[in-house]
């Protein structure tokens, strides 16, 4: 009885043949349908009805379980016979009632298999369906790959993914910030406001925004750009007006609040009042001043200028267009922008825009003519030295005679 039920149920398992000693060997009409049934369809299990086919993802799993059960129940020889059976049906030896009943059961199952095979080809699983999100991701991948390869994705040309990416619109003005086009009236008002004030406070900005029908952000950005343009213009003007510029090795200008030592206004008997030194009287026609000092320096371009205030020793100034003092010792005196301790009054002097060049310990002092004890109108040497004064004692505080200028 158990064998009979087993062979009766065998019709449901894909139409395989299970021969008995007293029955015919039979085969399905076509093994292709049986193979399709065993591969893709899970309706061959005895639990399910052959007509109902649930669209689930676990069909293959159920099919595998059923086939495993059938293979465990069947013999090894029968399995090999199933794999090696040719397409045409085999000849039958002797019919039996059991085989006829199994054929009756087989016929509806085979018809169900034939009706289910077209459904397999038409069925689309959820993971096969193309959703909007998948399409968008695919379009993004194609577009990015096309941009990397330099291909025209935005013109509808096929990209590396083999599709024409029409999903994305080409990047136009909508994706970028629109450039603000100011009218002439707005530009005039903005320029006028910038002329009076380069930085706008917020109340004034709000007022101008309402007046010019602009946003505060537009006005703020316009003022930022205008300030940058103004800085560039100032830089270009500065370079154009001063071709040499203020290089670090150029001497600083001697006209300023820090250089108030000697000036051309000392004429008419005005004395220079330092904190401790006595007033200088008897000014002559051309006093040593800033104008007189800077006048001869216009013709020469100094290379190097170092003021060593500690090494400066003050020197007396004689008459003939110079200051002199009999009691300059032990008193700080303003020389070349520095107050230094004075030495005894000596022969060399400042005379009408010429730097004194007394001979002694050398101090680097460029753009000054190298002048020994005598005065001479000579050209500027590139690297002359400003030397200290020889300590000539002034006899009884009297002024020494004026030395002559000579050019070395």
UniProtKB/Swiss-Prot annotation:
SMART domains: HOX. Residues 1-27, 44-120, 132-179, 233-278, 376-408 are annotated as: Disordered. One of its GO terms (biological process) is embryonic skeletal system morphogenesis. Keywords: Developmental protein, DNA-binding, Homeobox, Nucleus, Transcription, Transcription regulation. Transmembrane segments: none annotated. Disulfide bonds: none annotated. GO terms for cellular component: nucleus. It is found in: Nucleus. It comes from the Eukaryota. Residues 175-234 bind DNA. SUPFAM superfamilies: Homeodomain-like (SSF46689). Residues 68-83, 134-143, 387-398 have a biased composition (Polar residues). Residues 91-116 have a biased composition (Low complexity). A motif (Antp-type hexapeptide) lies at residues 124-129. PROSITE patterns: ANTENNAPEDIA, HOMEOBOX_1, HOMEOBOX_2. Sequence-specific transcription factor which is part of a developmental regulatory system that provides cells with specific positional identities on the anterior-posterior axis. Belongs to the Antp homeobox family. This is Homeobox protein Hox-D3a. It comes from Takifugu rubripes (Japanese pufferfish).
């Amino acid at each position: 009885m158990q064998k009979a039920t087993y062979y009766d149920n065998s019709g449901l398992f894909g139409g395989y043949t299970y021969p008995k000693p007293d029955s015919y060997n039979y085969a399905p009409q076509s093994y292709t349908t049986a193979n399709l049934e065993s591969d893709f369809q899970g309706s061959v299990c005895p639990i399910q009805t052959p007509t109902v086919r649930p669209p689930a993802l676990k069909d293959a799993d159920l099919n595998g379980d059923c086939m495993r059960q059938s293979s465990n129940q069947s013999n090894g020889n029968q399995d090999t016979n199933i794999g090696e059976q040719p397409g045409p049906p085999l000849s039958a030896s002797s019919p039996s009632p059991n085989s006829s009943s199994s054929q009756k059961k087989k016929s509806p199952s085979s018809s169900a298999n034939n009706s289910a095979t077209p459904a397999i080809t038409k069925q689309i699983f959820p993971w096969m369906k193309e959703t909007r999100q998948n399409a968008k991701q695919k379009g993004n991948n194609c577009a990015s790959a096309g941009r990397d390869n330099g291909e025209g994705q935005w013109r509808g040309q096929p990209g590396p993914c083999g599709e024409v990416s029409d999903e994305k619109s080409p990047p136009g003005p909508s994706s970028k910030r629109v450039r603000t086009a100011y009218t002439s009236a707005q530009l005039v008002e903005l320029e006028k406001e910038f002329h009076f004030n380069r930085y706008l406070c917020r109340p004034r900005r709000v007022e101008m925004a309402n007046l010019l029908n602009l946003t505060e952000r537009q006005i703020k950005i316009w003022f930022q750009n205008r300030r940058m343009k103004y800085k560039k213009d100032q830089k270009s003007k500065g370079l154009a007006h001063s071709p040499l510029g203020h290089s670090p090795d150029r001497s600083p200008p001697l006209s300023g609040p820090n250089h108030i030592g000697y000036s051309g206004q000392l004429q008419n008997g005005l004395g220079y009042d330092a904190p401790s030194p006595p007033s200088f009287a008897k000014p002559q026609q051309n006093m040593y001043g800033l104008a007189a000092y800077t006048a001869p320096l216009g013709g020469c371009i100094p290379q190097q200028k170092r003021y060593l205030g500690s090494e400066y020793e003050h020197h007396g100034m004689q008459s003939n267009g110079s200051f002199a003092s009999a009691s300059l010792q032990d008193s700080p005196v303003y020389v070349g922008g520095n107050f230094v301790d004075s030495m005894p009054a000596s022969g060399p002097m400042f005379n009408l825009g010429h730097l004194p060049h007394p001979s002694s310990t050398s101090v680097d002092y460029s753009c000054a003519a190298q002048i020994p004890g005598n005065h001479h109108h000579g050209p500027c040497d590139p690297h002359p030295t400003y030397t200290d004064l020889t300590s000539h004692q002034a006899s009884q505080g009297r002024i020494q005679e004026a030395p002559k200028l000579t050019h070395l």
